[in-house]
């Protein structure tokens, strides 16, 4: 080994800030420097990468101080080729050869520690080192994070920044977002149409009376004029088609539901009134005398009030069920009134 050109023995005295003169450690954690008095020559230009040493008494051997880690050991790429095995190679010692540099070569401040972005921040440490290495060595020895090395020696310095620098990186997401826009417009278009169109069928139902309502109005007018004629008409319709009244009632219920049942808020089905007041009074009188009718008595009543035998029979059945229900409710009411629930 030969000493570098024109280096005074105590050129690194400013960097050693510890009180003892034999202190061999710089302020930075990753630098180890040996004093020039140990090797009978000036301070060596090569400074090796080594982990920070905590003890002051444990001094390194001259061979360790004179050697540096190889230039191809740098940080392993996180975005490198997945086929490359992530392994940590053992550092191999290599002596630093002395070389002369032309005056045109620009020399930097720090030998092998930080990248260009980090070197810009370390301006105050420029006066601590007299003859640093050129930029070619800086790129090879760059180790931003300790204990991570690159697997292959062919890669150059990590000059690329991890930030995205260009609009090409974002073209695919923007295209995907643009493809979603027509779908949202397609979904919004039927909603606008639904707000404008309203059904107008209830108006036609409410304005134009149904033929069933016309029939009922005519029958009521006839009942006012001559009750006997209305009874005859009802008897004829009941004899001819007993199911027509059911169909008419269902149609009336549908008409009420369409015309705005939400205004009246009626609950339950519409009650049918197939019997007139005169007919119901006659049937109630007979029910008071006898709850169960014989076939002969039933035929007599049906002839007097212009009803069929079947209609009278059904009316008495319904009346008995109604009476039974009323008796049950009255009985429950009487039982509950005797007990005082507190």
Curated annotation (Swiss-Prot):
Chief location of this protein within or outside the cell: nucleus
General function of this protein: Sequence-specific transcription factor which is part of a developmental regulatory system that provides cells with specific positional identities on the anterior-posterior axis.
Organism: Pongo pygmaeus
Alphabetized SUPFAM superfamilies for the sequence: Homeodomain-like
GO CC, one annotated term: nucleus
Gene designation per UniProt: HOXC10
A Pfam short name: Homeodomain
Signal peptide span: none
Sequence ranges of Polar residues compositional bias: 204-219
Protein name (record): Homeobox protein Hox-C10
Annotated SMART domains: HOX
PANTHER family in the cross-refs: HOMEOBOX PROTEIN ABDOMINAL-B (PTHR45874), HOMEOBOX PROTEIN HOX-C10 (PTHR45874:SF2)
Glycyl lysine isopeptide (Lys-Gly) (interchain with G-Cter in SUMO2) crosslink, residue number(s): 106, 195, 254
Family: Belongs to the Abd-B homeobox family.
InterPro entries reported for this sequence: HD, HD_metazoa, Homeobox_CS, Homeodomain-like_sf, HXA10/ABDB-like
Keywords: Developmental protein, DNA-binding, Homeobox, Isopeptide bond, Nucleus, Phosphoprotein, Transcription, Transcription regulation, Ubl conjugation
Region of interest (Disordered), residue spans: 185-271
